[in-house]
């Protein structure tokens, strides 16, 4: 296996591949694509290789979140590496949660609209050929039910989100102290003369 050194082509390809989508899909594969949305990767966006900053990509089509492409510095300390990895893990966890949640929401919303239209005796299309919709009051029932049904899931998500962010903040503080300490150690000592 090629060495994954910062700046190496192998690392760049690996990073770009890990942040790329599944590529062009045929129409018959759309159902599979929707099923696999929970495990989807982010867009094909890849920052320039000479970049020395984190980049924010375009929104993911399933989670609607913008992925962050983290810069890997050449002289990254073990603590900085752990912080970056923790941030990447949190981002992937967040992407997966919202991709699953949005897929579930859209599916249940379509089923709700379809069942309500059938109960009214309407079809999925109006006489003019446009897609039939429900009014805001009818949709409010769906939103209320969906939120009630997913309350526990959202509570667990929020709890985990806060835990992860506190851990990231803690590591950011440690990294800041480590950097400050290394700068203090590098300063030349003044001699009295």
Curated annotation (Swiss-Prot):
Keywords: Apoptosis, Membrane, Mitochondrion, Mitochondrion inner membrane, Transit peptide, Ubl conjugation. Its main location: mitochondrion. Residues 1-26 form a transit peptide. It is found in: Mitochondrion inner membrane. InterPro entries: COA8. Induction: In conditions of increased oxidative stress, the protein is stabilized, increasing its mature intramitochondrial form and thereby protecting COX from oxidatively induced degradation. It is a peripheral membrane protein. One of its GO terms (biological process) is intrinsic apoptotic signaling pathway. One of its GO terms (cellular component) is mitochondrion. N-terminal mitochondrial targeting sequence is cleaved from the mature protein once in the mitochondrion. Belongs to the COA8 family. Required for cytochrome c complex (COX) IV assembly and function Protects COX assembly from oxidation-induced degradation, COX being the terminal component of the mitochondrial respiratory chain. This is Cytochrome c oxidase assembly factor 8. It comes from Rattus norvegicus. The lineage of its organism: Eukaryota, Metazoa, Chordata, Craniata, Vertebrata.
